[in-house]
């Protein structure tokens, strides 16, 4: 298993080059595309993670698939990752890069979980309110979690604001149990 420090080292190297060339936002988007393909395409992931396939073969495939779709900077970064046999750790490298890029661009990532998909207008309103409250640009990551029953659970960094129906029901249940035990004891 790769150390997070190594993922951060790769991310920092790419971040510094992207920032130096003024391509931070573009590289962030391109890396997101590549990692999304890696995470969702099981054939691509199996190919990339297969240690029997040489780095030069992987580079040829990457070039044929990504050339013209991503910047030379991202393509070269992927070549280095392949050469060093760090392919399975691409998602953690991306997350570390994204953290650095968000910090540099004054963006805070907010995870919003809801029982049903958020309407576009609701998402925009929530984003605007959070931007005002946090004083930073907000990037919403929405996720549908039917187990919440209703309401929202919003995570900003290590802070969770849980307004879900499930949590309200759990708290109500705890209060009822507590009140019932007080009645029995009294």
From Swiss-Prot:
Q: Where in the cell is it found?
A: Cell membrane
Q: Which family does it belong to?
A: Belongs to the ATPase delta chain family.
Output a single Gene Ontology CC term carried by this record. plasma membrane
| Function of the molecule | F(1)F(0) ATP synthase produces ATP from ADP in the presence of a proton or sodium gradient. F-type ATPases consist of two structural domains, F(1) containing the extramembraneous catalytic core and F(0) containing the membrane proton channel, linked together by a central stalk and a peripheral stalk. During catalysis, ATP synthesis in the catalytic domain of F(1) is coupled via a rotary mechanism of the central stalk subunits to proton translocation. This protein is part of the stalk that links CF(0) to CF(1). It either transmits conformational changes from CF(0) to CF(1) or is implicated in proton conduction.
> Its principal location?
membrane
> Ion transport: is it a keyword of this entry?
yes
| GN (gene name) | atpH
Question: Can you name one GO molecular function term for this protein?
Answer: proton-transporting ATP synthase activity, rotational mechanism
Regarding the membrane, this protein is recorded as: Peripheral membrane protein
Organism name: Symbiobacterium thermophilum (strain DSM 24528 / JCM 14929 / IAM 14863 / T)
Against NCBIfam families, the record matches this protein to: ATP_synt_delta (TIGR01145), PRK05758.2-2 (NF004402), PRK05758.2-4 (NF004403)
Protein known as:
ATP synthase subunit delta
Per UniProt, subunit arrangement is:
F-type ATPases have 2 components, F(1) - the catalytic core - and F(0) - the membrane proton channel. F(1) has five subunits: alpha(3), beta(3), gamma(1), delta(1), epsilon(1). F(0) has three main subunits: a(1), b(2) and c(10-14). The alpha and beta chains form an alternating ring which encloses part of the gamma chain. F(1) is attached to F(0) by a central stalk formed by the gamma and epsilon chains, while a peripheral stalk is formed by the delta and b chains.
Which UniProt keywords are listed?
ATP synthesis, Cell membrane, CF(1), Hydrogen ion transport, Ion transport, Membrane, Transport
């Amino acid at each position: 298993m790769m150390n997070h420090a190594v993922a951060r080292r790769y991310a920092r190297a790419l971040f510094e080059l992207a920032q130096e060339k003024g391509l931070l936002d573009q590289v962030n988007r391109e890396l997101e595309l590549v990692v999304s393909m890696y995470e969702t395409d099981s054939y691509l992931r199996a190919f990339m993670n297969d240690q029997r396939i040489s780095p030069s073969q992987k580079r040829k495939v990457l070039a044929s698939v990504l050339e013209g779709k991503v910047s030379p900077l991202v393509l070269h970064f992927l070549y280095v990752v392949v050469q060093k046999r760090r392919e399975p750790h691409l998602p953690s490298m991306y997350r570390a890069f994204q953290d650095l890029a968000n910090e540099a661009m004054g963006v805070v990532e907010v995870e919003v979980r809801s029982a049903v998909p958020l309407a576009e207008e609701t998402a925009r309103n929530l984003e605007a309110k959070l931007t005002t409250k946090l004083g930073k640009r907000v990037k919403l990551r929405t996720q549908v979690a039917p187990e919440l029953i209703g309401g929202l659970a919003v995570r900003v960094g290590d802070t969770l604001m849980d307004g879900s129906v499930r949590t309200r029901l759990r708290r109500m249940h705890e209060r009822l149990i507590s009140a019932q035990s007080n009645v029995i004891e009294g």
